[in-house]
Protein backbone atom coordinates (compact mmCIF):
# COMPACT_ATOMS: atom_id res chain seq x y z
CA UNK A 1 0.00 0.00 0.00
CA UNK A 2 2.86 2.41 0.78
CA UNK A 3 4.33 1.86 -2.69
CA UNK A 4 0.94 2.53 -4.29
CA UNK A 5 0.57 5.75 -2.28
CA UNK A 6 4.08 6.84 -3.20
CA UNK A 7 3.41 6.17 -6.87
CA UNK A 8 0.13 8.06 -6.73
CA UNK A 9 1.77 11.01 -5.00
CA UNK A 10 4.47 10.95 -7.67
CA UNK A 11 1.78 10.86 -10.37
CA UNK A 12 0.07 13.87 -8.81
CA UNK A 13 3.39 15.70 -8.64
CA UNK A 14 4.03 14.97 -12.33
CA UNK A 15 0.52 16.19 -13.15
CA UNK A 16 1.13 19.36 -11.19
CA UNK A 17 4.39 19.96 -13.02
CA UNK A 18 2.39 19.88 -16.25
CA UNK A 19 -0.19 22.44 -15.09
CA UNK A 20 -0.45 25.33 -17.51
CA UNK A 21 0.98 28.78 -16.73
CA UNK A 22 -2.47 30.43 -16.51
CA UNK A 23 -3.48 27.91 -13.85
CA UNK A 24 -0.40 28.81 -11.83
CA UNK A 25 -1.90 32.29 -11.38
CA UNK A 26 -4.27 30.59 -8.94
CA UNK A 27 -2.81 29.44 -5.61
CA UNK A 28 -4.66 26.10 -5.55
CA UNK A 29 -4.74 23.26 -8.05
CA UNK A 30 -8.31 22.30 -9.01
CA UNK A 31 -9.12 18.64 -9.61
CA UNK A 32 -12.51 17.29 -10.72
CA UNK A 33 -13.79 13.88 -11.69
CA UNK A 34 -14.73 10.37 -10.72
CA UNK A 35 -16.74 9.77 -7.57
CA UNK A 36 -15.18 6.28 -7.46
CA UNK A 37 -11.64 7.72 -7.42
CA UNK A 38 -12.59 10.64 -5.13
CA UNK A 39 -11.84 9.00 -1.74
CA UNK A 40 -8.42 7.85 -2.93
CA UNK A 41 -7.67 11.19 -4.61
CA UNK A 42 -8.62 13.00 -1.39
CA UNK A 43 -6.04 11.05 0.61
CA UNK A 44 -3.38 11.68 -2.04
CA UNK A 45 -4.20 15.40 -2.21
CA UNK A 46 -4.07 15.75 1.59
CA UNK A 47 -0.71 13.97 1.75
CA UNK A 48 0.57 16.12 -1.09
CA UNK A 49 -0.45 19.25 0.83
CA UNK A 50 1.28 18.03 4.00
CA UNK A 51 4.48 16.89 2.30
CA UNK A 52 5.18 19.69 -0.20
CA UNK A 53 5.37 23.46 -0.24
CA UNK A 54 2.12 23.59 -2.24
CA UNK A 55 -1.39 23.98 -0.77
CA UNK A 56 -3.65 20.94 -0.72
CA UNK A 57 -5.39 20.68 -4.12
CA UNK A 58 -9.13 21.41 -4.24
CA UNK A 59 -11.10 18.30 -5.24
CA UNK A 60 -14.65 18.09 -6.55
CA UNK A 61 -16.54 14.85 -7.20
CA UNK A 62 -18.35 15.34 -10.52
CA UNK A 63 -18.28 11.83 -11.97
CA UNK A 64 -15.88 10.74 -14.70
CA UNK A 65 -17.94 12.14 -17.58
CA UNK A 66 -18.73 15.38 -15.75
CA UNK A 67 -15.09 15.88 -14.83
CA UNK A 68 -13.90 15.29 -18.37
CA UNK A 69 -16.53 17.71 -19.68
CA UNK A 70 -15.38 20.45 -17.28
CA UNK A 71 -11.70 19.74 -17.95
CA UNK A 72 -12.18 19.88 -21.72
CA UNK A 73 -14.02 23.22 -21.70
CA UNK A 74 -10.80 25.21 -21.94
CA UNK A 75 -7.47 26.33 -20.51
CA UNK A 76 -7.11 28.93 -17.77
CA UNK A 77 -7.85 29.64 -14.14
CA UNK A 78 -11.60 29.16 -14.56
CA UNK A 79 -11.12 25.52 -15.69
CA UNK A 80 -9.93 22.45 -13.75
CA UNK A 81 -6.22 21.61 -13.94
CA UNK A 82 -6.59 17.86 -13.54
CA UNK A 83 -9.41 15.36 -13.96
CA UNK A 84 -9.70 11.89 -12.42
CA UNK A 85 -11.57 9.19 -14.25
CA UNK A 86 -12.37 5.58 -13.47
CA UNK A 87 -12.34 4.87 -17.22
CA UNK A 88 -10.38 5.84 -20.29
CA UNK A 89 -11.18 9.07 -22.10
CA UNK A 90 -13.53 8.61 -25.06
CA UNK A 91 -12.45 9.82 -28.49
CA UNK A 92 -15.33 12.32 -28.49
CA UNK A 93 -14.07 13.74 -25.17
CA UNK A 94 -10.53 13.96 -26.53
CA UNK A 95 -11.81 15.72 -29.66
CA UNK A 96 -13.79 18.16 -27.48
CA UNK A 97 -10.63 18.95 -25.50
CA UNK A 98 -8.66 19.56 -28.68
CA UNK A 99 -11.33 21.84 -30.15
CA UNK A 100 -11.29 23.94 -26.94
CA UNK A 101 -7.51 24.35 -26.85
CA UNK A 102 -6.84 21.65 -24.25
CA UNK A 103 -4.04 20.03 -26.21
CA UNK A 104 -1.53 18.79 -23.64
CA UNK A 105 -3.27 15.77 -22.12
CA UNK A 106 -1.32 13.14 -20.20
CA UNK A 107 -2.89 9.91 -18.99
CA UNK A 108 -1.45 8.51 -15.76
CA UNK A 109 -2.77 5.02 -15.02
CA UNK A 110 -2.86 3.91 -11.40
Task: Provide a role label for each language-model segment.
Residues 19-25:
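Sec/Tat signal peptide C-region and signal peptidase I cleavage site
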Residues 25-110:
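N-terminal segment of the mature folded domain
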Residues 1, 19, 106-110:
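Short intrinsically disordered, low-complexity coil segments enriched in acidic
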Residues 1-10:
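Bacterial N-terminal signal peptides that target proteins for export
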Residues 9-18:
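Bacterial N-terminal signal peptides
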Amino acid sequence: MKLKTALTTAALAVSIAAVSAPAMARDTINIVGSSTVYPFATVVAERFGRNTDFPTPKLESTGSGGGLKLFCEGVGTQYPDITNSSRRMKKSEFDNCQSNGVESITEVRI
